[in-house]
Swiss-Prot record:
InterPro entries, A to Z: GapR-like (IPR018753), GapR-like_DNA-bd (IPR046367)
Taxonomy, superkingdom: Bacteria
HAMAP family (alphabetical): UPF0335 (MF_00797)
Record-given protein name: UPF0335 protein RPE_4107
Source organism of this protein record: Rhodopseudomonas palustris (strain BisA53)
Pfam families attached to this UniProt entry: GapR_DNA-bd (PF10073)
Length: 89
């Protein structure tokens, strides 16, 4: 019967440990990159605001550009319907 000390030294176990460590380190590195990118995006929005642009409108445009044309048209139709129902158009 293998002891826990013997299991620690088995090549397959060491490989699994190394692989797990590599995965964790990759995730940590990507999380740091994600934070850096988020900071950069925040800086661009701050720059836009400083130049007089409406940040809320910019965020809406960025979100809309991610949608395909059909999805965007459907949402615009729904919004227009709701605005008409509320007497806002």
């Amino acid at each position: 019967m293998a002891t826990s000390a013997a299991v620690k030294d088995e090549p397959a176990t060491q490989f699994a440990k190394d692989q797990l460590k590599a995965i964790i380190e990759r995730i940590e590195r990507l999380e740091e990159e994600k934070k850096t990118i988020s900071d950069d995006i925040r800086d661009v929005y701050a720059e836009a605001k400083g130049n007089g642009y409406d940040v809320k409108a910019l965020r809406t445009i960025v979100r809309m550009r991610k949608q395909d044309a059909d999805e965007r048209a459907e949402q615009e139709t729904i919004l227009e319907t709701y605005l008409q129902a509320l007497g806002m158009l």
